[in-house]
Design a protein with these regions (language model features):
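S-adenosyl-L-methionine
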Residues: 1-64, 72-79, 100-127
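Short beta-strand element of Class I
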Residues: 84-87
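Conserved SAM/SAH-binding beta-strand->alpha-helix loop
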Residues: 92
Length: 159
């Protein structure tokens, strides 16, 4: 596996089309990356699956948002539903910085972040552990063959 060609679920190289960085982070964002982001970042276990209950003690539901951009939707949902554990998966450093800034400023405690390819996260989740997945502005647009990836981790009746 190389950085430019991560592996897909079948172990074959696949292309990544999103940007990982844009303009340079300003001093305040850089400090948030150093001081705040590490506590929010999800570290995947080498073996086994990710324990969402341990990440979010007391949470009744778990929701994943993939490609959250600036994080406006994710932050609003997290503030509106404090009983839910939210995972945001994003690779773009500008979007990550913007959301971390908002999490820090508003004291949002029910959000954890994954800052790599969401596919790596999906394969570490137990089947039927998520109550919903938000994919609001997909790039590239999802294809029918991608459906099996979401169905495996969504609980029955989830949407």
């Amino acid at each position: 596996m190389t950085k430019s060609h991560p592996l897909n679920l079948a172990g074959e190289p696949r292309a990544f089309f999103g940007r990982r960085s844009g303009k340079r982070l300003h001093k305040g964002q850089d400090q948030l990356f150093r001081d705040v982001l590490p506590a929010l970042t999800i570290a995947l276990p080498e073996r086994g699956t990710l324990d969402l209950a341990a990440l979010f003690p007391g949470a009744r539901n778990f929701i994943l948002e993939i490609g959250y951009g600036g994080g406006e939707h994710l932050a609003r949902q997290a503030l509106s539903h404090p009983e839910t554990g939210f995972i945001g998966a994003e690779v773009f450093s500008g979007g990550i910085a913007k959301l971390v800034q908002q999490i820090d400023a508003e004291g949002i405690g029910n959000v954890r972040l994954f800052t790599d390819d969401a596919l790596k996260l999906l394969v570490k989740l137990e089947p039927a552990t998520l109550d919903a997945v938000y994919l609001l502005y997909p790039d590239p647009w999802p294809k029918t063959r991608h459906h099996k990836r979401w169905c495996r981790v969504l609980g029955q009746g989830s949407g």
